[in-house]
Amino acid sequence: MEKNFLSLIKTRRSVRAYKSEPVPSKALDAVLEAGTDAPTGGGHQSPTIIAITDPKYRREIAKLNAEVLGSNTDPYYGAPVVILVLADGSASTFVEDGSCVLENMMLAAHALGLGTVWVHREREIFDSESGKALLREW
């Protein structure tokens, strides 16, 4: 196995402070492509990836996540992009599928010099009426 790849895995860390500048679109596209190419059970590719760059939606999703957390702080630590991975709960491998998508994207972001942090609570957000309404808007 190439040392560069192993080094990438070993040096990836969670980042909890971000610059406010936008992520270049080519870099964001590469990260999203890495998620799309992740392995999934039966090759079904059922997870949905949503990249939130619009400040209005970014604030709204942060507010919903903070409510689930019971906090009034930004659960996404000021990141200019929030990427959500929604996995089909009817698939027997939905947790594994979503996890593979997330890991691929986190490694791709690290390779491109971008920071990431895995933030939970999407299930709770989108089970709520506010979350369901937000999904309908998208």
Residue ranges and their predicted role:
Residues M1-W138:
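Acidic, surface-exposed loops and disordered segments
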